[in-house]
């Protein structure tokens, strides 16, 4: 699944402004400015992270993501799947320039199976430069350039088919939008 999701991310057309065709319920999820981890936790008894890939990569391995970050010799890559009650909900890809990892940013390489949002949203120095939204094959995604103490990282989140982003509460339980 992680390879498929990672490949799919590379084919997404990104919008700098939310498109007019974006359903309101989905747009609310995509434009979430707080922790996506905390929002997802409201919809399940257990949120679990499976680490798919982690380690340093070269600038040549970034593709168009390179345009979203400052030039550096290497970047820390972390790819995960978040599961809500054992259902795959979100594929996350984080790219961190080596310079961001200096000082307190080094903790980003030691998160392991913990949700990134738990760490990031505890940091008082966290800011968000933007949220871009995108869609591919009926799946919605968002990417944000976040900064810790002024140093950037790129977080991309692909909402998988079983994610609550595609459901809305109805009279008879959750219904597909």
Swiss-Prot record:
Gene3D superfamilies: Chorismate lyase-like (3.40.1410.10). One of its GO terms (biological process) is ubiquinone biosynthetic process. Pathway: Cofactor biosynthesis; ubiquinone biosynthesis. Its EC number is 4.1.3.40. It catalyses: chorismate = 4-hydroxybenzoate + pyruvate. It is found in: Cytoplasm. One of its GO terms (cellular component) is cytosol. Substrate binds at residues 36, 78, 116, 157. GO terms for molecular function: chorismate lyase activity. SUPFAM superfamilies: Chorismate lyase-like (SSF64288). Its main location: cytoplasm. Keywords: Cytoplasm, Lyase, Pyruvate, Ubiquinone biosynthesis. InterPro entries: Chorismate--pyruvate_lyase, Chorismate_lyase_/UTRA_dom_sf. Monomer. Belongs to the UbiC family. Removes the pyruvyl group from chorismate, with concomitant aromatization of the ring, to provide 4-hydroxybenzoate (4HB) for the ubiquinone pathway. This is Chorismate pyruvate-lyase. It comes from Pectobacterium atrosepticum (strain SCRI 1043 / ATCC BAA-672).
């Amino acid at each position: 699944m992680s390879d498929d999701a990672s490949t799919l991310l590379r084919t997404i057309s990104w919008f700098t402004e939310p498109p007019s065709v974006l359903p309101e319920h989905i747009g609310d999820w995509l434009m979430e400015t707080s922790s996506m981890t905390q929002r997802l936790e409201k919809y399940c008894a257990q949120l679990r992270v499976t680490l798919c890939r982690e380690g340093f990569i070269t600038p040549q391995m970034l593709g168009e993501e390179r345009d979203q970050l400052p030039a550096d010799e290497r970047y820390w890559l972390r790819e995960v799947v978040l599961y809500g009650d054992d259902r795959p909900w979100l594929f996350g890809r984080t790219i961190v320039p080596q310079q961001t990892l200096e000082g307190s940013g080094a903790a980003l390489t030691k998160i392991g199976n913990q949700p990134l949002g738990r760490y990031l949203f505890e940091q008082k120095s966290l800011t968000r430069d933007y949220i871009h939204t995108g869609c591919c094959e009926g799946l919605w995604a968002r990417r944000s350039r976040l900064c810790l103490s002024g140093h950037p990282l790129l977080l991309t989140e692909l909402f998988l088919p079983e994610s609550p982003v595609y459901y809305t509460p109805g009279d008879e339980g959750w219904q597909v939008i």
